[in-house]
């Protein structure tokens, strides 16, 4: 909520935050944050906050990934994984490893362009020095 109330990104326009684990509770409270911005006469979140805040996909079940992609713009989502991570076991409900987060993203109905954004393009944009290094190596 401090991102909404303050002007951090006006003062530091190149500052970027990547909130791990799908943003935690952020997608669940998105309406609250939008309402707070409106109540405080702040610009919409996409203008005031989302140019600098990103979320990773390190979420351990399909409904969580689905919510993240329903709420957060595709340009603000980066692939993230802890594989082999904190929850290494096999989910008895699915038969797959809990921490195989790529399969949850793969299960989404994404265009090739959006899939590229999540797995590579957004990271290159968020980390321009990495992008320059990779381009320098022909990647």
Model-derived features with residue positions:
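Mid-to-C-terminal alpha-helical segments outside catalytic/metal-binding sites
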Residues: 55, 66-67, 71-78, 84-139
């Amino acid at each position: 909520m401090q991102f909404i109330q303050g002007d951090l990104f006006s003062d530091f326009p190149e500052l970027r935050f990547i909130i791990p684990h799908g943003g935690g509770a952020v997608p669940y409270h998105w309406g609250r944050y939008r309402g707070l911005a409106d109540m405080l006469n702040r610009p919409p979140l996409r203008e005031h906050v989302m140019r600098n805040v990103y979320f990773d996909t390190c979420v351990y079940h399909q409904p969580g990934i689905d919510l993240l992609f329903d709420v957060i713009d595709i340009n603000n989502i980066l692939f993230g994984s802890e594989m082999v991570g904190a929850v290494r076991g096999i989910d008895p409900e699915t038969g797959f490893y809990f921490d195989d987060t790529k399969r949850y993203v793969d299960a989404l109905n994404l265009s090739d362009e959006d899939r590229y954004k999540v797995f590579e393009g957004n990271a290159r944009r968020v980390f321009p020095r990495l992008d320059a290094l990779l381009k320098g190596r022909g990647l």
